[in-house]
Design a protein with these regions (language model features):
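Short acidic/glycine-enriched loop/turn segments that link adjacent beta-strands
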Residues: 35-38, 64, 96-100
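A short acidic/small-residue loop/turn micro-motif
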Residues: 98, 118-121
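Vicinal oxygen chelate
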Residues: 14-15, 70-108
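Short, solvent-exposed beta-strand edge segments and adjacent coil->beta transition regions
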Residues: 5-7, 65-69
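Core segments of cupin and vicinal oxygen chelate
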Residues: 2, 9-53, 85
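Active-site beta-strand termini and strand-to-loop segments that position acidic
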Residues: 41-46, 104-107, 117
Length: 121
């Protein structure tokens, strides 16, 4: 069996705030009708090439560190500063020969990384 990634879904406290943050990060617009309860990016695009992003308001708070996180790629050194201006927080920086990445948290504390290039091998 082979499956493909169709959507990325976040449980969150404020769906609109989270969707607005990720919309700015990804350079993709919010879908019409997005609200504090449910918001989406790319969900209305039937012919999409990238996964849709969904944000659902849930009553319970985040309890622990993510067991899965997103790895973003942007070679521009200014990308980390731009993410901080959008509301992200830097929690760590790492480097190996030819590769560097910054560990960050989005406005609701979900961990993600941004690297200068995609990880290989």
């Amino acid at each position: 069996m082979a499956a493909r990634l169709g959507n990325i879904t976040f449980d969150c406290d404020d769906a609109l705030k989270m969707a607005a943050f990720w919309s700015a990060v990804l350079g993709r617009p919010l879908d019409k009708g997005s609200s504090e309860v449910f918001a989406s990016i790319g969900g209305a695009d039937a012919g999409r090439k990238e996964p849709a992003w969904y944000f659902n308001k849930v009553p319970e708070p985040k309890q622990a560190k993510n067991r899965v996180h997103l790895d973003l790629v942007n070679p521009d050194p200014a990308a980390v500063d731009e993410l901080v201006q959008l509301g992200a927080m830097v929690t760590g920086q790492h480097q190996i020969p030819g590769q560097h990445w910054t560990v960050m948290e989005d406005p609701e504390g979900n961990v993600f990384c941004i690297a200068n290039k995609a990880f290989t091998g």
